[in-house]
Amino acid sequence: MKINIPENAKKVINQLNNSAFEAYAVGGCVRNAMMGIEPHDWDICTSAKPDEMERVFKDYETHDFGLKHGTLTVMSGGEAFEVTTYRIDGAYSDNRHPEQVTFTDDLTLDLSRRDFTCNAMAYNDKDGVIDPFGGAEDIKKGILRCVGDPDKRFNEDALRILRGLRFASTCGFDIEKSTAQSIHKNAALLNNIAYERIRSELTGLLRGEAVCKILTEFRNVIAVFIPEIKPTFDFPQHTKHHVYDVWQHIVHSIDSVEQNDILRMTMLLHDLGKPQACTTDKNGCNHFKGHQQISAELAEKILKRLRFPNEFSETCLKLILWHDERCSGSKKQIKRLLNNIGEENTRLLFKVQRADTAAQSEYLRAEKFASIDLAERQTEEILAENQCFNLKSLEVNGSDIKALGVKEGRAIGELLNKLLDDVIEERVPNDKGALLRLAQKYISK
């Protein structure tokens, strides 16, 4: 198979080859190229030792911050390429990093330390694909398989557990039986991994086309670092609005929303409070009053634990809190929604509600979708016509109220909000004169 290596990467490989060293593109770039995906990064492995690499690239701009592990960053044509000496990893005491590395001249030994067969391939134009572990065949069959002993691979670096789930989710691969068994067996090792790294892999996993399958088959793995999901497993909903238990509803809702990180994380967390909120009536029907607030409280802890950025978390929490707010064709409700969560979040909320509805039963589904469509159209009308829905669009401001003799800041704010409420409820037009007259009446009372 011919892989088109970019000229800047080829230049680095040729520089090593011309100096009598082996050099290959390796790992994810080879995998992606074989799958027809444009690689973002081209990593290079070589038989040259670190000091030899420095000599080979003495006329290049280089960065040596990874040199003790055998990695030299080489600048070629304005691009950075990581060039790493073939190596064998020593013992892993922290389930993340080897205590030491030993350099080798053997490419196969270097490839043998890698995580999955699809990532254990190398390529250059002269030798073609070097594939000692059958990675190309596994890619062709859509199989994710560890290189060698899965238990050993996951004990070396526990993050590989989540990385494997991400690959399976994004590439649609089936996880080979012994690899899958080892993932379940070693899931607790994820407790040794930094939450920032877990966050990155989880986000990628949620973005995948096969997310529904992975979250169903490997839910206990996710529960290692998000134990709050456990109560939703197999928790029945017993209502005509639902056909799935709570966890399966969550999973199908993720699969039903676009591949946007905020939206997919929101769907993962939006109903976690249902088991706590559940009550059962005399007819055996479950109700989940207040589950939005409980879900948001649980979500806040999870997002903080996984070190999500504040802005990302705030958006998720607003969407979770308001995900069951149905506007029922009322522009007044929509204006209150816009005032509470803002324009962009309101648009996102409708996407959340569509995904939520898609993961429910067929009972009134068409009517629910129609209601969301109507609310969306009315929202755009309100925005296009610059209708008043917040203090910013109110025709009076704090200075106007202060001029009427109200001096205390809190009282000014309360009066402005009262006027806004009157405008939204259409008791008074959004006209400065009318609002000032009404404000004067409130002050005089």
Model-derived segments and their meaning:
Residues 1-445:
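Catalytic cores of the polymerase beta-like nucleotidyltransferase superfamily
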